[in-house]
Amino acid sequence: MLVMENTIRVNKRISNSIRLKVTSRCELHCNFCHKEGSTSIEDLCWDRNLREAILAFKQSMNIDEIHFTGGEPTESKYLGELTQALISNGFKVKTTTNGLCEKERLIALYSNGLRYLNFSIHTLDPVGLQRIQKRMNIADALKIVDIQKKNILLIKKLGAAVKINTVVSSIDDIESACTVYNFTKDHGISIRFLNNLSKGIKSVNAIKILVQKLHAQKTREEVTIGSSSKTAFYTDRDHYEFGVKEIQDFKLQTVCATCAIDCKEHFYGMRLEKRNGELFVRLCLAKEDKKTFINLKAFFLSEQFKELKELTTLN
């Protein structure tokens, strides 16, 4: 649905995706990572329980897009099998990645059908990378930046759709963000700047300064109905477009109405993960209780499910 607001084009779409937390492992230790809410999970593999769960989401909530998350999804040995199985069941499959897997692994995943990759690249400056990691020497930082660049260009050359996500926590990150921006602009790759939820307005203001530095003008917005997800798109003087993630004030009433936490993400979406052999739906990163972390079978009988179903099955 396309509307116009003060000459800015606004495209509104209904949420149609769910995030699968396929592993909690990651070789990086970024100081702003929220780990999708938990580290105490098991790797997801394609079995009858997961298949039935995914198809139940598809049938009841029109979910047709799966986004792998983690941890670092490529750390999971099951990722290729998951990709093939989900595609064969009619799903569009995307993954987030730090871009550090071996190139042979990346090529294999492409052969499995993976065509949409969001690279989490927060700087291409080795010194800047050291600053956002808990422990890293300069030699390792140089090696990581080189691998990331090569893998991004490799998978793009193979034909996959590539997007870069870059977190800007404060004004101290602006120069590092510009190193990524220049790389994506030079190679015709999409980039989206993300605010650090834990830094609040400090991070938001830093991105505003970055946009000014890039001499860019807002041209359009994409809003997801049933989620706090929103992206504002800007165009610089060379007509290169980039995105800025924004959080719209959307809260799930069955989860957020009585919550005392000053949540920065609001309700972003559903996350599916496995713990102690059981599948759970996670609805919040800020806390874990019976309203926000629900056994799969109980979820489909819950008030949260009813509210989400109404939102995601709107005509």
What are the residue ranges of the model-derived segments?
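Short, Lys/Arg-enriched N-terminal segments with co-localized hydrophobic residues
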Residues: 1-3
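Canonical Radical SAM [4Fe-4S] cluster-binding loop centered on the CxxxCxxC motif
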Residues: 6-49, 61, 283
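Secreted/processed peptides and extracellular or luminal domains of membrane proteins
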Residues: 32, 36-39, 207-214, 262-265, ...
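Radical SAM enzyme [4Fe-4S]-AdoMet core and its adjacent flexible, acidic
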Residues: 127, 136-254
